[in-house]
Amino acid sequence: MSRDYKGKKIVIYPQYIDSSIPRSRGRRIPRNIAIPKPRIEEIIEAAEELGLNPKYEESAYPKHWWIKGRIVVDKVGSKLNTLKLIAQKIKDLRK
């Protein structure tokens, strides 16, 4: 449950960094920073490389209830900054 993480952890759904999803449907970062179709495995790998201690949970984003999966990471600054760092790391890993 998200309330258990308040102040200590950040919940990340793949939709937050997906460039193919508009902001009205859940994207949180600018399209030029976001990445197309991020996979859970990529988010976990990027978070591990950034030292964020990722943990997978079988939960759905409310606007996309049919897609399961979210990642919980340690809070190290703002949520927006963390999302940008993860998106950039995934871009680097895809090269």
UniProtKB/Swiss-Prot annotation:
Gene Ontology cellular component list: signal recognition particle
Highest taxon, organism lineage: Archaea
Keywords: Cytoplasm, Ribonucleoprotein, RNA-binding, Signal recognition particle
Keyword set includes Secreted: no
Keyword Kinase: no
GO biological process terms, semicolon-separated: SRP-dependent cotranslational protein targeting to membrane, signal sequence recognition
Compartment(s) where it occurs, according to its Swiss-Prot or TrEMBL record: Cytoplasm
Major location category of this protein: cytoplasm
Alphabetized PANTHER family for the sequence: SIGNAL RECOGNITION PARTICLE 19 KD PROTEIN (PTHR17453), SIGNAL RECOGNITION PARTICLE 19 KDA PROTEIN (PTHR17453:SF0)
Annotated family: Belongs to the SRP19 family.
Task performed by this protein: Involved in targeting and insertion of nascent membrane proteins into the cytoplasmic membrane. Binds directly to 7S RNA and mediates binding of the 54 kDa subunit of the SRP.
Protein name: Signal recognition particle 19 kDa protein
Organism per entry: Staphylothermus marinus (strain ATCC 43588 / DSM 3639 / JCM 9404 / F1)
Gene name of this polypeptide: srp19
